[in-house]
Amino acid sequence: MGTVHLIDHPLVQHKLTMMRRKDASTNSFRRLANEISALMTYEVLRDIPMQEIEIETPLEVTTGRVIDGKKLVFVSILRAGTGILDGMLTIVPGARVGHIGLYRDPRTLVAVEYYFKMPGDLHERDVVVVDPLLATGNSAVAAVERLKECGPKSIKFVCLLTCPEGVAALDKAHPDVPIYTAAVDRQLDEHGYILPGIGDAGDRIFGTK
């Protein structure tokens, strides 16, 4: 069984509530998405491997801890994933970035891949997949399956909110992939949207219809 990490810090929950409002402007929605993802990054990377190195301060030589190995790859599921990518890169600016282009067929709700670009040494890195919503789970399942073909050291999935159906779908296909989210909402509607949700994250981030 996979693990769902619910990040319920007061700042995260406050900002998520502001995002949910239907009268939130594109600018406000985008800013809040970045702020929430930045705050969530602390918890997502809590168990990242560390190593000790020797450094020199203005007063003496000492040791300190830094992130070990070749670090991270943030993988954005296009297009909405880019809306929370910047917030995470604010915290880890040295991370590599990959992109998976997926669109949801409006009739079948099946994820269709149209783009895939990753660092060449993905097998030496830890991957954090980012997408604002884990709804039907079809895109997440397809993205993780594709990434596993490259053999990364580990994979985590980060979203602003999800629902029981999305959690169940990703857990059934990839029980080894932990999910980090700010909320688990009630359910999906007949069109595959999360209720009460935040609407179409991509449209609200980019100001499109």
From Swiss-Prot:
Matches recorded under Gene3D superfamilies: 3.40.50.2020
One GO term (biological process): UMP salvage
Keyword Magnesium: yes
Gene name for this UniProt entry: upp
Enzyme class at the top of the EC tree: transferase
Family classification: Belongs to the UPRTase family.
Source organism: Rhodococcus opacus (strain B4)
Cofactor: record remark: Binds 1 Mg(2+) ion per subunit. The magnesium is bound as Mg-PRPP.
UniProt pathway: Pyrimidine metabolism; UMP biosynthesis via salvage pathway; UMP from uracil: step 1/1
Inhibition and activation profile: Allosterically activated by GTP.
Role summary: Catalyzes the conversion of uracil and 5-phospho-alpha-D-ribose 1-diphosphate (PRPP) to UMP and diphosphate.
Residues annotated to bind 5-phospho-alpha-D-ribose 1-diphosphate: 79, 104, 131-139, 200
EC number: 2.4.2.9
Reactions listed under catalytic activity: UMP + diphosphate = 5-phospho-alpha-D-ribose 1-diphosphate + uracil
Cofactor: Mg(2+)
Protein name per UniProt: Uracil phosphoribosyltransferase
